[in-house]
Amino acid sequence: MAKRHLLLVTTCLWALSCALLLHASSDGFLRVNLNKKRLDKEDLTAAKLAQQGNRLLKTGSSDSDPVPLVDYLNTQYYGVIGLGSPPQNFTVIFDTGSSNLWVPSAKCYFSIACYLHSRYNSKKSSSYKADGETCKITYGSGAISGFFSKDNVLVGDLVVKNQKFIEATRETSVTFIIGKFDGILGLGYPEISVGKAPPIWQSMQEQELLADDVFSFWLNRDPDASSGGELVFGGMDPKHYKGDHTYVPVSRKGYWQFNMGDLLIDGHSTGFCAKGCAAIVDSGTSLLAGPTAIVAQVNHAIGAEGIISTECKEVVSEYGEMILNLLIAQTDPQKVCSQVGLCMFDGKRSVSNGIESVVDKENLGSDAMCSVCEMAVVWIENQLRENKTKELILNYANQLCERLPSPNGESTVSCHQISKMPNLAFTIANKTFILTPEQYIVKLEQGGQTVCISGFMAFDIPPPRGPLWILGDVFMGAYHTVFDFGKDRIGFAKSA
């Protein structure tokens, strides 16, 4: 039987000059220290593009192996792996939201991104095996195409043999040009893997390289800390979490998806997910992404700048009282918008139609009015539960129409008001997971000054897959996360 390992991946902050210092610590882990570079507002664009491009659009042992990882804007975590014999080094994003491993190929001749990053040369590897199957992966802001090959992958000093991966011969996105990473190492389920290539954790499992069939993330969100965090294959480091993990079963294989409950603002329900929403834990997403109807309420609660929607204000002004009266009369909320004439079908459409239809003036029409109406129903129904007066309810809905999240995802807040902002909490497995303002507000530099942005962005997915939350690095920074592929479950515990 092959020797089983606990593979530790140590994450550190980005350095323009990466002076590497390797040493074995008292706990048996081999760690890598990196210098760090303080980032500014200009880096947000690159991080945002990387985050958008990184979304795939598809229906305890004494042994340790170190890999230096980089924390880019506290949002993208990536590190160096080796490919081939002898190893050719590549910087890759460790992404739980996709499943393929790909790197630029030496046969990539016509994409600028390839010339700006390391390229894999099969002629220099004695362990290379040809495959040749062509493939293409489409992302949120571009695509890569190429062909499959097989070779050994070095993660730390652990060798995964004959891993199937993609040699990218074309990269059609500015994301890949400006990104500080060469490729992506997907950690999702094989169900979303292009070409049925096994994700690397599955190969580790089949080759009996792991102490346990799990991997775990600890992301250090402290911008002043020397370490960016740890990714551990085969176990979890008890120094990086407090108490026991709360586990939830994977509800749908592909992404690391589970059934989540409500989002609470200062202990009060936002209503939209009161009966449950799907959620995905995704290390490749920078922020927290969720339904527009909820993010608008979050924006209002924290004083974030937003987009004023004339369609929204029109619906509240002309139909708000009618919606309110129907809800008071116990009308099924899914039928309210069709009864007031703004939606064609009962419950056939959802707020999850896309934020563009709500705030983009160039996309007016019945779709926009229906989407706004459905949001208004959620807001008004939620306020009725709080026993608010009619005047307060309609005034609140009108205020939310001025706080709709920007389509580009960035919502600025006052840095001086952070201490006065409410706690937010996700309900998972009937337990509340609190995020403090210090945890969900992201600080960055712009012209020597600190700028604060909300960690929440609008991201609408229509039924049947939605509504959907994506819990990215903002959430994973607060909660140590275990991905248990042996038992198909996800665990959360407060980060230490």
From Swiss-Prot:
Keyword DNA repair: no
Saposin B-type domain boundaries: 307-407
Predominant localisation class: other
Span of the signal peptide: 1-24
SUPFAM superfamilies, A to Z: Acid proteases, Saposin
Enzyme type, top EC level: hydrolase
Residues carrying a glycan: N387
Family: Belongs to the peptidase A1 family.
Identification of the protein by name: Aspartic proteinase
Lineage: Eukaryota, Viridiplantae, Streptophyta, Embryophyta, Tracheophyta
Gene: RAP
